[in-house]
Amino acid sequence: MNDKIAIIGAGSWGTAVACSLGKNGHRVVLWSHTAGVADSINTEHINVKYLPKHKLPKTVSASTDMEEVCKDASFIFLASPSLYLTSAVEELLKFAPFSHDDGEMPYPTIAVLTKGFIPDENGEPQFIIDVLEKMLPDFYKNHLVYVAGPSHGEEVAEGKLTGLIAASQNPMCSIRCREILRSRSLLVYSSLDIIGVQVCAAAKNVVAVAFGVLDALTVTSDIFGDNTESLLLAAGLNEIQTIGRAMGATHPETFTSISGVGDLDVTCRSKYGRNRRFGNEIITKKILLSFENLDDLIKNIDKIGYLPEGVVACKYLNILAEKRNLKLPICSGLYKILNKELKPLDLIENLLQGDTK
């Protein structure tokens, strides 16, 4: 397969997808915003910063030059974190074919791997796909693909059996993405429910942070255990469905699919989960002491050393809950913890006793 595939974002997930595609015979070029990461991929065939334990195929290379990465690519995956995604796309738009919106040049298919929301001018969460459709040439209206599912990058790179959903309002685009991604170890299913899949992908990270808090509290309290975790998981799924309905999701089966309960389960329970880790470290490392409030935490989130997307999503979902009068006890309670208005133990006890105030 000689078609070039570009991946914008050389974090653990973008690199893992590149690894899988490379093993499947594709030529892949990663865009990294740091030269050190690109150099390690090109010289050692390892992403030393974000995926250091996994050797990459020689068909995978990297560059900090956006034009070089995207030139002649037939397929582009966007994998930058939600905080930085629009900046990366603005850079992408400077180069052909995106710099010539004449409808004549062939446009590559674009799929989004990023999980999260992008706020509007009022701070309410917007779907990533909606924001990108406004930024990209008109051709991409209803033609973007959103990819999600229970898929930690470490296991995808190891070739462990994984399932993903490729959602698009254009069935042919989702099918093309499915055919490019799937392999013996990567099962990919098509979906038309691009709204529901995006809600699940973003909101489950908030639940996972709360799950990490509970995980840490089980060590210091004898009233929490495996049963408690399942109780929180079920409450989290219910909350995600509430968010989905408020944001226009119309396919309830999405929430019980691999992109719904499947992704929620692995994000909460897996040892690889950054959101669970962050929630745990709120208790075990008193990590919030280094920040004044939630806004300060988001502004200086690089200081943590890893990116828990649930922290950012929590802020936007709390705004959504307040403006639309939604009962989101996990999101709203976690917001108060991150903003230093509530003690972690109080949140968990309130949730598990059915107090949604």
UniProtKB/Swiss-Prot annotation:
Major subcellular site: cytoplasm
Name under which the protein is recorded: Glycerol-3-phosphate dehydrogenase [NAD(P)+]
PROSITE patterns hit by this protein: NAD_G3PDH
GO biological process, one term: carbohydrate metabolic process
Source species, domain of life: Bacteria
Subcellular location: Cytoplasm
Pfam families the record matches: NAD_Gly3P_dh_C, NAD_Gly3P_dh_N
Tagged with keyword Transport: no
Entry function: Catalyzes the reduction of the glycolytic intermediate dihydroxyacetone phosphate (DHAP) to sn-glycerol 3-phosphate (G3P), the key precursor for phospholipid synthesis.
InterPro entries: 6-PGluconate_DH-like_C_sf, 6PGD_dom2, G3P_DH_NAD-dep, G3P_DH_NAD-dep_C, G3P_DH_NAD-dep_N, NAD(P)-bd_dom_sf
EC number: 1.1.1.94
Keywords annotated in UniProt: Cytoplasm, Lipid biosynthesis, Lipid metabolism, NAD, NADP, Nucleotide-binding, Oxidoreductase, Phospholipid biosynthesis, Phospholipid metabolism
Catalyses which reaction(s): sn-glycerol 3-phosphate + NAD(+) = dihydroxyacetone phosphate + NADH + H(+); sn-glycerol 3-phosphate + NADP(+) = dihydroxyacetone phosphate + NADPH + H(+)
Keyword Transmembrane: no
One cellular-component annotation, GO: cytosol
UniProt similarity note: Belongs to the NAD-dependent glycerol-3-phosphate dehydrogenase family.
Biological pathway: Membrane lipid metabolism; glycerophospholipid metabolism
GO MF, one annotated term: glycerol-3-phosphate dehydrogenase [NAD(P)+] activity
Residues that, per the record, bind NADPH: 12-13, 33, 115, 153, 274, 307, 309
UniProt-annotated binding residues for sn-glycerol 3-phosphate: 115, 149, 151, 204, 263, 274-275
SUPFAM superfamilies linked: 6-phosphogluconate dehydrogenase C-terminal domain-like, NAD(P)-binding Rossmann-fold domains
Residues at the active site: 204 (proton acceptor)
